[in-house]
Design a protein with these regions (language model features):
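Conserved anion-binding
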Residues: 4, 66-159
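Residue-level detection of beta-strand scaffold positions
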Residues: 24, 51, 158-160, 165
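Phosphate- and divalent-cation-binding pockets in alpha/beta enzyme and binding domains
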Residues: 15, 92, 172
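Conserved N-terminal beta1-alpha1 strand-loop-helix module at the mouth
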Residues: 1-68, 76, 117, 124-127
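Alpha/beta catalytic cores of nucleotide-metabolism and tRNA/nucleoside-modifying enzymes
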Residues: 156-158, 169-173
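Structural detector of well-ordered beta-strand residues that form the stable sheet scaffold
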Residues: 5, 31, 57-58, 108, ...
């Protein structure tokens, strides 16, 4: 299944409703991006939940430690999905997955910065993650990285939904 997700990364907080409101009929998933959460706190997840009660809400926590704690924080704020960095230790990932499973939520493991994305995606599947994220970071994009380069290899390697982020636009599609 293909879903369209919009990430709110950098936006004045007072423009959230006027920016997201017109998008609600056109997107399936609303994401509180990492910079947005860092700027304004997890309250932005609550606001996205209020704006799009029927939408899937993602908190891009990029957890690197304390997976269970961060998962609980994201889910308490109204997220359906939270992210953990794939380079985090297995215990961190397992903690987030355990909380997500207990609460009927999901975890995406973001492969940003992982050298062997296919091998790690296979390991993550074994840890029970619900989705893997193929994410080409802004800094890598500036150096000319192709945001879709790893996609085919990863989708062929794991039987998990794959989320694609970073550098996806009309030119790259």
């Amino acid at each position: 299944m293909t879903s369209l997700q919009v990430a709110i990364d950098v936006l004045p907080l007072d423009e959230l409703e006027s920016t997201v409101g017109p998008l609600l009929d056109h997107v399936d998933v609303l994401e509180a991006g990492t910079p947005f959460i860092k700027m304004y706190g997890l309250g932005v997840v609550r606001r996205l939940r209020a704006l799009g009660p029927g939408h899937l809400i993602v908190a891009d926590m990029k957890a690197m430690d304390a997976g269970a704690l961060e998962a609980n924080m994201a889910f308490d704020a109204g997220a359906d999905v939270m992210t953990v960095l794939a380079c985090a230790g297995d215990a961190t990932i397992e903690g987030a997955v355990r909380v997500a499973n207990d609460r009927g939520k999901r975890v995406v493991c973001d492969l940003i910065g992982v050298p062997d994305k296919v091998a790690r995606a296979r390991q993550l599947a074994g840890l029970g993650v619900h989705m893997v994220g193929v994410h080409t970071g802004t800094d890598d994009q500036a150096r000319g990285a192709d945001p879709l380069a790893d996609l085919a290899a990863i989708t062929g390697a794991v039987d998990l939904p794959v989320v694609v982020a970073g550098g996806i636009n009309a030119t790259t599609l």
